[in-house]
Amino acid sequence: MTRIIEFSGTVLTGPQTEHHGLRSVDGLLTFHRPAAAPDLVLDGWVIPGLVDAHCHIGLGPGGDVPEGVAERQAVADRDAGTLLVRDAGAVHDTRWIQQRADLPRLIRSGRH
């Protein structure tokens, strides 16, 4: 069964360009209205995902943190709208974050 989500708010597609009527049809975005009614209608603004260009997932004020804390750091970034993180280094391997589809994409740079 096809899942349709309609975003009834404004979509920013450029510095001074707005569109309306964005839909997700089975996860693919389109401005074309499908024949079927939406399963869910969301109101608000749609903006591109954010990039965190300098982050240290897995580090806290005292240095290394447990994996659960590192996960909460990645979730906090995601919940703030960040879809891509440039991780500038951590004590432990954070490669496991890259395997999680529900967390931001991770580009690892620096020492890991």
Regions found by a protein language model. Give the residues of each.
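N-terminal metal-binding scaffold of metallo-dependent hydrolase/deaminase domains
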Residues: 1-35, 46
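Divalent metal-coordination and catalytic microenvironments
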Residues: 9, 27, 43, 54, ...
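Gly/Ser/Thr-rich beta-alpha loop segments that engage phosphate groups in nucleotides
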Residues: 11, 51, 60-62, 83, ...
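Flexible, glycine-rich phosphate/dinucleotide-binding loops
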Residues: 30, 38, 94
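Divalent-metal coordination cores built from histidine and acidic residues
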Residues: 67-112
